[in-house]
């Protein structure tokens, strides 16, 4: 997790995005830290070559920033975590008064089918299941973009070429990241393409109609064993418990890639 502020700073500097970057929890709240360097490389964002950093992270801890920002808000803030939920879970426990201040949480993580880090668990949830359990039991409205949805966004060499033609630093960054991803997908799984997981969350926020969801009761398994870190999704409602999550089911991939290209071209127009 320590590499994440550096990655965030690198991306912001390359794309000239003038927003503050905050460092958060260096470890999960209970378990030992795990990484997916076989997929994302040693830095967590291998592929692009970044210039030396000329900026640094803010001195305020990310958890404090989350709490302070939410407490000062009118309840109109949506959180979009695309990694382990450690920072949000700690913020919820430190200051429960933030819960009604959160409009919703649109997260990338979990699966109602097969995992990708274990047969049962998706990486982001498996990296800190106890934190995920705090979030999923918080009562805050949740939207889950899990593997069943995100794996439909298969990026191929043709998609990469399309974004390269769109041009600019954003197209270049997309190409560098996804060419590395395709390399590791082939090396690890023998696949010729790879999903673009995180962007589905932003796609949903821009146009929810592009993604079909189903209301489900979702519980995170924190028991030791082969299902540790699994998001148990009551797809058929057999438990009789109220739904706590909108779970992504299908995505209009033509719309999705069109939106990604629109964002790449939109970056060029604003810089």
From Swiss-Prot:
CC per GO annotation: cytosol
Gene Ontology process terms (BP): purine nucleoside catabolic process
Record keyword Transit peptide present: no
SUPFAM superfamilies for the chain: Nucleoside hydrolase
EC number(s) reported in the record: 3.2.2.8
Binding site for substrate: 185, 197
Keywords per UniProt: Glycosidase, Hydrolase
Pfam families noted in UniProt: IU_nuc_hydro
Claim: Hydrolase is one of the keywords in the record: yes
Catalytic reaction(s) noted: a pyrimidine ribonucleoside + H2O = a pyrimidine nucleobase + D-ribose
Top-level class of the enzyme under EC nomenclature: hydrolase
InterPro entries recorded: Inosine/uridine_hydrolase_dom, IUNH, Ribo_hydro-like
NCBIfam families referenced in this protein's UniProt entry, alphabetically: PRK09955.1
Homology family: Belongs to the IUNH family. RihB subfamily.
Record-given protein name: Putative pyrimidine-specific ribonucleoside hydrolase RihB
Species for this entry: Shigella dysenteriae serotype 1 (strain Sd197)
